[in-house]
Amino acid sequence: MQAKRLINRKQSGFTLIEVMVVIVILGILAVLVVPNVLGRADKAKVDSTKLALSNVAGALDQYKVDNGHYPTPAEGGLEALVKQPESVKNWVPGGYLKGGYPKDSWENNLQYNQPGSEGRSYDLYSFGADGKPGGEGLDADIYYSEQ
């Protein structure tokens, strides 16, 4: 009878402990990185909405220079910046805003009230991420305030 010889082979691959250590490290990195990345995306949407409000405010000011008043509800409000109201004679060909009715970063229509509250000529704002009045955090209304 021949004796069976055991052959030692070099094992390749990772041990269970090595795999678990890598998973723990990846979990820790995810906990640290993901909130920062998500927070930046949310801040970018708020900043983009503020920029859109500022651009619309500039268009409203130009409308006032051309027509002597800000768009009224009877003229369609912000719609008067993209489509000429019948009663307006000094409207800029092509409109005051390119790209249609203005929207915020969440694709909700911007809000416009004329006359505005607290003695302002108008109120220009976004309802925030939820598209509803009020709210907190990302859902809070974002007002244009440089009037």
Residue map of PLM features:
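Short, surface-exposed interaction loops/tails
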Residues: 4, 46-47, 58-61, 65-67, ...
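Short acidic, Pro/Gly- and aromatic-enriched capping/linker segments at domain boundaries
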Residues: 89-104
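N-terminal single-pass transmembrane signal-anchor helix
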Residues: 11-37
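Short clusters of hydrophobic/aromatic residues that line enzyme substrate/ligand-binding pockets
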Residues: 70, 97, 142
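N-terminal leader/signal peptides at the extreme start of proteins
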Residues: 1-14
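Conserved hydrophobic/amphipathic alpha-helical signal-anchor segments
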Residues: 40-86
